[in-house]
Amino acid sequence: AFAQIGDGVIVFDGSAGDDETADPHAPPGYDLAFWPDNGEYANTTRFLTQADFRDHLRIEIVPRRICELAVMTDGLQMLALDVAGSRVHDRFFAPLFRTVKAGSDEETLTASLLGFMDSKRVNERTDDDKTLLLATRIIPDVPASLPDPAA
């Protein structure tokens, strides 16, 4: 389940997750939990502590396994979203998740992410805050019950 107030973005893999007929070699696709709510003006910020927070709280239940998740602040929205098409730029997220999955250690991943976030390509397109959280299942399928190693 996802919950959000205001702008920022929650993105997750659009694969069927439990669909055994899905092509494992198909390019990844991503879904947006909610379109960002910028309020009346671009710089409007909504807070959970506001009296009218319930009017702006959005909740989404996704009844399937999610293997890739990204949460970001509004500073990266223009790079990550196709505003005209009201959808996610898959090509923004796919390389990020490939890097996370292939990362051999925390130091390498940190250097790679910092290099991307502070790159000329990113900085030319935003002057706002840039916060990005990436989470992925390294092992996509974990059995519901594991064999007892003592047996």
Language-model-derived ranges and their functions:
Residues 5-6, 36-37, 74, 150:
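Secondary-structure transition/turn motif
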Residues 46-151:
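C-terminal catalytic subdomain
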Residues 11-54:
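Glycine- and acidic-residue-rich phosphate-binding/metal-coordinating active-site segment common to enzymes
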Residues 1-15:
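Conserved catalytic micro-motifs used in adenylation/nucleotidyl-transfer and phosphoryl/amide-
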